[in-house]
Amino acid sequence: MTIYDKTFLLGTGQGSSQKASNRYIVIHDTANDNNQGDNSATNEASYMHNNWQNAYTHAIAGWDKVYLVGEPGYVAYGAGSPANERSPFQIELSHYSDPAKQRSSYINYINAVREQAKVFGIPLTLDGAGNGIKTHKWVSDNLWGDHQDPYSYLTRIGISKDQLAKDLANGIGGASKSNQSNNDDSTHAINYTPNMEEKEMTYLIFAKDTKRWYITNGIEIRYIKTGRVLGNYQNQWLKFKLPVDTMFQAEVDKEFGTGATNPNRDISKG
């Protein structure tokens, strides 16, 4: 079970009070080769805590513990908009010069991501379309920014992209079922209980330039053709009340594919 340390957790009046939608977990590395000693993670967490107005993530994986800075479930300032608003958990991997600590911190990194993916109902797929685990590089390539982490540091410590994807999907050295952590109690380790809304995978997307509405579970997406059907999902007809994510049409097409977002694939056609 991952040990979460709240020493550097932001307090009242600190950090964002905005809830994040449950679409991504963004993974980073600290990119700080000037901080590779035994206290690397605590140094990074302390700095983020004291400078949160500039940038912070929810957690920093160290060799001994995972140090929390931002409250999971809320927006953190780690990857820019719109990734921040879509990510209830973002985590940094600390740098170490000691190979044993490199390995230990990586194990904590993977375990924390898998545990939080289970809490927030996020698929354990890496850098793919729709919901899932996203590297900061994926965010830069597809949404905003120029950061390329964490692949360079991972390569340096002997972790390929394929290995990262396997470890996220199956756990370190394992072949467990997707979205299962090594210990069923581990998702409660930070004393966080998701509410019913946070367990809900289905949500609406509004393409603000084309005025199109879609419904998606983060993997499959369908166009909503009629106002009556849309009203069901918006609770106008006392049926559902789904959360809404607003995007440009090009963003929707890039994330799900133009074939998937074609209006000919409207939800009424099954």
UniProtKB/Swiss-Prot annotation:
What are the boundaries of the signal sequence? none
**GO process terms (BP):** cell wall organization; defense response to bacterium; peptidoglycan catabolic process; symbiont-mediated cytolysis of host cell
**Looking at the keywords, is Cell wall biogenesis/degradation present?**
yes
Q: What class of enzyme is it?
A: hydrolase
Keyword line: Antimicrobial, Bacteriolytic enzyme, Cell wall biogenesis/degradation, Hydrolase, Secreted
| Record's protein name | N-acetylmuramoyl-L-alanine amidase
Biological classification of the source: Viruses, Duplodnaviria, Heunggongvirae, Uroviricota, Caudoviricetes
Query: Which SUPFAM superfamilies has this protein been placed in?
Result: N-acetylmuramoyl-L-alanine amidase-like
Q: Where in the cell is it found?
A: Secreted
Give EC number(s), comma-separated.
3.5.1.28
A GO cellular-component term linked to this record: extracellular region
Question: From what organism does this protein derive?
Answer: Lactococcus phage r1t (Bacteriophage r1t)
Q: Which residues form the N-acetylmuramoyl-L-alanine amidase domain?
A: 22-151
Q: Which reaction does it catalyse?
A: Hydrolyzes the link between N-acetylmuramoyl residues and L-amino acid residues in certain cell-wall glycopeptides
The record's Pfam families line, in alphabetical order, gives: Amidase_2 (PF01510)
Q: Family membership, please give it.
A: Belongs to the N-acetylmuramoyl-L-alanine amidase 2 family.
**GO molecular function annotations of the record:** N-acetylmuramoyl-L-alanine amidase activity
Instruction: Say which domain of life the source belongs to.
Output: Viruses
